[in-house]
Amino acid sequence: MKVLWAALLVTFLAGCQAKVEQPVEPETEPELRQQAEGQSGQPWELALGRFWDYLRWVQTLSEQVQEELLSPQVTQELTTLMDETMKELKAYKSELEEQLSPVAEETRARLSKELQAAQARLGADMEDVRSRLVQYRSEVQAMLGQSTEELRARLASHLRKLRKRLLRDADDLQKRLAVYQAGAREGAERGVSAIRERLGPLVEQGRVRAATVGSLASQPLQERAQALGERLRARMEEMGSRTRDRLDEVKEQVAEVRAKLEEQAQQISLQAEAFQARLKSWFEPLVEDMQRQWAGLVEKVQAAVGASTAPVPSDNH
């Protein structure tokens, strides 16, 4: 059974290794739409794609965009998309950090620091986009009724530059994540190798036991059953003999205990009778003396009562 569990564990670890070894394809497309379609499907990349799609729509500077730029709706939408992107990115980073546990502490700290810096640059770029749009909205509101062509051209230029920065930082972040995941894969491979080394002797023992069982299986089934029956019969006879001997010992012990109890009961009865006789000899004289004193006291009381009730002689005679 232990060998079976060991084999299952090795199979499970091999599956985990295969899962870790999935390649990460770097992004090479320069355009926003191509970048969104070429992503590997990570949640943070999908969230960043939605941010880019929204930025692409803002860059059109259509009439609807111009109307919504005069309200805080665009900045609110961008803030929501930014928060969603950073949240998904942090979750993915935490997942990779768990996979990096077998890696050396120094390597893990360096990779984490580089990834955190790339993450901060991407967040700063998205915040810069939002700030530019807020500034543009304030300037448009201040120039209501005037020509805003120059302002729109300046905003379009800023957004194009910010778009390039976003693409560059996102590509850098993906490369950092690829390095991060490669470190996780390396640590997982080392962990699996160590486990395989520890499980090697167990697997060999299981192989030897399996060979032994196979040699036993070559014996005729009837001979093995007969030998097993004889062993069981001998074992049952031995257990029966021990049980009978033990029962005889218990009977003897019970008889001894009963005799001792009867003897002790007889001794207690004799001691009680002797004690009762002593008590009687102690208290009988005392009781007789108290009876005599009580009788004398009664006679005295009666005499005193009789004397007090006698008639007194009259002086007139």
From Swiss-Prot:
Homotetramer. May interact with ABCA1; functionally associated with ABCA1 in the biogenesis of HDLs. May interact with APP/A4 amyloid-beta peptide; the interaction is extremely stable in vitro but its physiological significance is unclear. May interact with MAPT. May interact with MAP2. In the cerebrospinal fluid, interacts with secreted SORL1. Interacts with PMEL; this allows the loading of PMEL luminal fragment on ILVs to induce fibril nucleation. Residues 80-255 are annotated as: 8 X 22 AA approximate tandem repeats. Heparin binds at L162, R163, K164, R165, G229, E230, R231, L232, R233, A234, R235, M236. The modification Phosphoserine is found at S147. Residues 278-290 are annotated as: Specificity for association with VLDL. This is Apolipoprotein E. Keywords: Chylomicron, Endosome, Extracellular matrix, Glycoprotein, HDL, Heparin-binding, Lipid transport, Lipid-binding, Oxidation, Phosphoprotein, Repeat, Secreted, Signal, Transport, VLDL. GO terms for biological process: AMPA glutamate receptor clustering; amyloid precursor protein metabolic process; artery morphogenesis; cellular response to lipoprotein particle stimulus; cholesterol catabolic process; cholesterol efflux; cholesterol homeostasis; chylomicron remnant clearance. It comes from Macaca nemestrina. Pfam families: Apolipoprotein (PF01442). Belongs to the apolipoprotein A1/A4/E family. GO terms for molecular function: amyloid-beta binding; antioxidant activity; cholesterol transfer activity; enzyme binding; heparan sulfate proteoglycan binding; heparin binding; identical protein binding; lipoprotein particle binding. Glycans are attached at T212.
